[in-house]
Amino acid sequence: MYNGQKLYISDVTLRDGMHAIRHQYSIDQAVAIAKALDDAKVDSIEVAHGDGLRGSSFNYGFGAHSDLEWIEAVASVLKHARVATLLLPGIGTLHDLDAAFKAGVRTVRVATHCTEADVSRQHIEHARKLGMDTVGFLMMSHMTSPQILAQQAKLMENYGAECIYVVDSGGALSMQQVADRFKAFKDVLKPETQTGMHAHHNLALGVANSIVAVENGCDRIDASLAGMGAGAGNAPLEVFIATADRMGWNHGTDLFGLMNAADDLVRPLQDRPVRVDRETLALGYAGVYSSFLRHAEAASARYGIAAVDILVELGRRRMVGGQEDMIVDVALDLIKTRQRTTGTSGVAA
């Protein structure tokens, strides 16, 4: 049950939301969104390329600006919220973390695949030495059992992480599965170690799963304005806050300020609607990394293979974050299969 303590509200519009617009926020847009979030009194605002520090690349897509340009601009206008960022070991380095800290970042979420927490040790330990609020971020949490996930969380705690997240990168978890994972966390983590929930809305459960997480002892909730994020988006921040408000939970934010920011600042930027539709539902159904969506749609347009077919096959092969290069391989394999079964040339003109 909810323990009555103030929830920590972590906004991800300027990081996960990057995926929805191919990492193309302008500095002015990022600053306007950050100011609105700060005025609404969220606790932290995550800023980075969608794939974290140093994510701008051929594999993930190039950003309109560097991480440091976005971070410095946002940090310069905040009066309440702290600046957070995301780091994936193997993409971002300790040098990138140092630079982000100097630019104003005070919270870092060190993200690994749900069974690879051991690669986070160096980065978590370094963040603690810098005095940062240090979070372990276990992505694709649906791909392993609650007990194994909890063991991975314990590793991150041992390295120095002060909060560990269940990260539903594929938007594939049910409410019971969320509850089971938080119960497993509470069984092994120290009482003082916080827990967090990062939901995606691919099965339209982003808010529901966040509510269930809080009811099972979760301290921090990730959400984004208008759900701005990969796939069908994250839990929409304004919807979660409205629900929390009706439930009498202490969140400390301005609901109507968030509602205005979602509709006036964020929704107009969506060149592809962030919603549950045929393709994003396929992500949740197949348990596919949500940021694969735009890459799969590009491959679909290029090769004439339905994006849903590509996404379902990616799920069957259990592809994970970092394997974006395999999306084209899957599309080409599906063309070969179609050629064998129909005798057609396969590739669209």
Swiss-Prot record:
Mn(2+) binds at residues 16, 198, 200. InterPro entries: 2-IPM_HCS-like, 4OH_2_O-val_aldolase, Aldolase_TIM, DmpG_comm, DRE_TIM_HOA, PYR_CT. The active site is at 19 (proton acceptor). The keyword Ubl conjugation does not apply. GO terms for biological process: catabolic process; L-leucine biosynthetic process. GO terms for molecular function: 2-isopropylmalate synthase activity; 4-hydroxy-2-oxovalerate aldolase activity; manganese ion binding. It catalyses: (S)-4-hydroxy-2-oxopentanoate = acetaldehyde + pyruvate. The record marks 15 as: Transition state stabilizer. Gene3D superfamilies: 1.10.8.60, Aldolase class I. Keywords: Aromatic hydrocarbons catabolism, Lyase, Manganese, Metal-binding, Plasmid. It holds the Pfam family HMGL-like. Its EC number is 4.1.3.39. Substrate binds at residues 15-16, 169, 198, 289. Signal peptide: none annotated. Residues 7-259 form the Pyruvate carboxyltransferase domain. Belongs to the 4-hydroxy-2-oxovalerate aldolase family. This is 4-hydroxy-2-oxovalerate aldolase. It comes from Polaromonas sp. (strain JS666 / ATCC BAA-500).
